[in-house]
């Protein structure tokens, strides 16, 4: 069972592990520094579909299916999936995973959805509420532009501060099996509002919560330091 350490940290004694994971992306993402580690690269951003939203559903379903297969299980073995995306009602997710038949708990954490879904999945597994939980998320540059900025058809000029939303999806399978990567603690962040007024510069709005992780997690009366702080979507300006 999870044990609260201090005010913000949840210690997971059983240390749930990541038994399977997958990430699929679009062409632009494949040209970045992580291009050679993705499971699949879609050269066609439409993925053969008629809309950006439907394409995102294809990405999401593909990532979840690949992660489950790499974990050596079937969709029927998954007790729950925590998943979400950037769209209204998480439509990219719901239409993507509906055919898998996994009990679905929708998560809307914007750019924190992957971390939030993994946190929830880990807590459920550690609590023995379930044996196998899936955590996943997706986004698409074109559907996100329509949702948060301007539709591409509008032809608006991008500002120098505008981040580029990932076209892709990621998924993990969280279990109690002996895994190389384990989740020992969960820390839920607090809202940090620095009154950023530029709607294009989402990175600057999100960055403060990453650098203000205080108080540090406390374990056995000793303050712990973070070995690494990994984040995405903030860009150089953020």
Predicted regions and their residues:
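Condensing-enzyme catalytic core mediating Claisen C-C bond formation in acyl metabolism
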Residues: 1-53, 151-225, 238
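Short secondary-structure capping/junction motifs at helix and strand boundaries
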Residues: 75-76, 127-136, 181-183
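Short, well-ordered, mixed-charge alpha-helical segments that flank or form enzyme active sites
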Residues: 89-91, 141-146, 192-196, 233-236
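A glycine- and small-aliphatic-rich helix-loop capping segment at beta-alpha/alpha-beta transitions
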Residues: 33-37, 93-103, 125-127, 148-157
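Short beta-strand segments
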Residues: 19, 83-84, 133-139
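Active-site-proximal alpha-helical scaffold in enzymes
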Residues: 108-135, 174
């Amino acid at each position: 069972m999870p044990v609260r350490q201090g005010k913000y940290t949840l210690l997971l004694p059983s240390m749930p592990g990541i038994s399977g994971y997958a990430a699929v992306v679009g062409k632009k993402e494949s040209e970045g520094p992580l291009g050679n580690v993705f499971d699949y690269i879609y050269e066609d951003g439409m993925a053969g579909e008629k809309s950006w939203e439907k394409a995102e559903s294809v990405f999401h379903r593909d990532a979840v299916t690949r992660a489950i297969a790499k974990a050596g299980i079937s969709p029927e073995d998954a007790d729950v999936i925590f998943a979400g995306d950037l769209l209204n009602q998480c439509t990219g997710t719901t239409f993507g995973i509906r055919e898998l038949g996994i009990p679905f708990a929708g998560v809307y954490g914007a750019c924190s959805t992957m971390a939030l879904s993994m946190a929830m999945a880990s807590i459920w597994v550690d609590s023995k509420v379930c044996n196998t939980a899936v955590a996943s998320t997706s986004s698409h540059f074109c559907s996100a532009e329509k949702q948060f900025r301007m539709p591409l058809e509008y032809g608006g000029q991008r500002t120098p501060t505008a981040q580029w939303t990932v076209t892709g999806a990621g998924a993990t399978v969280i279990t109690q099996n002996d895994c190389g990567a384990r989740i020992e603690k969960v820390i839920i962040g607090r809202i940090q509002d620095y009154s950023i007024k530029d709607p294009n510069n989402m990175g600057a709005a999100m960055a403060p919560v990453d650098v203000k992780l205080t108080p540090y997690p406390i374990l056995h009366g000793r303050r712990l330091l973070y070995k690494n702080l990994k984040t995405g979507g903030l860009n150089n300006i953020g």
